[in-house]
């Protein structure tokens, strides 16, 4: 059972109850706190678009604690982050792995953060298929193209040469917050708000 906390806010018109995510959204904070699938992606994209409509000149904060997930769902979030006018600041809390790490690094340069005990993990895309040999070949080519594109984006965002990204994403590559700053995945470790 997934319990969502409720907060009570006093206004001049009385009390108002919000689920915690709606209250955070009021402060332009979005939480990605799960694996990334189509439903999660659609929710994050909708929140980004809503906040842009509310104020296109004010930053949005995306807090990430995610093991990763679907590439296409994650790319929908990535593309929306780049499509909208507001800068999207990313903050790793806990773990940003796989597509979670990709989205963390996709935040606005200079506004990509992690808390001190956060862990970031990068690797190559995972996938699998079955069927006729020709279909398997089609899917294999597709995942190789996705890997190349994601490595190019990661190289651009981190400042690392593409060869370094290719080598370092060959297997699961775990980094501390400090190592992530050195690598260019994030810009700074946040100690206090």
Curated annotation (Swiss-Prot):
Residue runs in coiled coils: none
Keyword Protease: yes
Annotated GO MF terms: ATP-dependent peptidase activity; ATPase binding; serine-type endopeptidase activity
Residues annotated as the enzyme's active site: 98 (nucleophile), 123
CDD domains on file: S14_ClpP_2
Catalytic activity: Hydrolysis of proteins to small peptides in the presence of ATP and magnesium. alpha-casein is the usual test substrate. In the absence of ATP, only oligopeptides shorter than five residues are hydrolyzed (such as succinyl-Leu-Tyr-|-NHMec, and Leu-Tyr-Leu-|-Tyr-Trp, in which cleavage of the -Tyr-|-Leu- and -Tyr-|-Trp bonds also occurs)
Subcellular location: Cytoplasm
This protein's UniProt keywords: Cytoplasm, Hydrolase, Protease, Serine protease
GO biological process, alphabetically ordered: protein quality control for misfolded or incompletely synthesized proteins
Enzyme Commission number, as recorded: 3.4.21.92
Record GO cellular component, one term: cytoplasm
Chief localisation class: cytoplasm
Assembly behavior: Fourteen ClpP subunits assemble into 2 heptameric rings which stack back to back to give a disk-like structure with a central cavity, resembling the structure of eukaryotic proteasomes.
Entry similarity comment: Belongs to the peptidase S14 family.
Job of this protein: Cleaves peptides in various proteins in a process that requires ATP hydrolysis. Has a chymotrypsin-like activity. Plays a major role in the degradation of misfolded proteins. ClpXP is involved in the complete degradation of the Site-2 clipped anti-sigma-W factor RsiW. This results in the release of SigW and the transcription activation of the genes under the control of the sigma-W factor.
Entry protein name: ATP-dependent Clp protease proteolytic subunit
Organism: Oceanobacillus iheyensis (strain DSM 14371 / CIP 107618 / JCM 11309 / KCTC 3954 / HTE831)
Gene, per the UniProt record: clpP
């Amino acid at each position: 059972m997934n319990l969502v906390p409720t907060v009570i806010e006093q206004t001049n018109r009385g009390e108002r109850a919000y689920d915690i995510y709606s209250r955070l959204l009021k402060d332009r904070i979005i939480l990605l706190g799960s694996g990334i699938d189509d439903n999660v992606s659609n929710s994050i994209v909708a929140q980004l678009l809503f906040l842009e409509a509310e104020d296109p000149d004010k930053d949005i904060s995306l807090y990430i604690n995610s093991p990763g997930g679907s590439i296409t769902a994650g790319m929908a979030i990535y593309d929306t982050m780049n499509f909208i006018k507001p800068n999207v600041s990313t903050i790793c809390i806990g773990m940003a792995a796989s597509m979670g790490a990709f989205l963390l690094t996709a935040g606005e340069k200079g506004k990509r953060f992690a808390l001190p005990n956060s862990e970031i993990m990068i690797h190559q895309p995972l996938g699998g298929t079955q069927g006729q040999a020709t279909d398997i070949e089609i899917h294999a080519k597709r995942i190789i193209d996705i890997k190349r594109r994601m490595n190019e984006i990661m190289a651009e965002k981190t400042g690392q040469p593409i060869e370094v990204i290719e080598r370092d994403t060959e297997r699961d590559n775990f980094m501390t917050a400090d190592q992530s700053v050195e690598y260019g995945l994030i810009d700074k470790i946040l100690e206090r708000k």
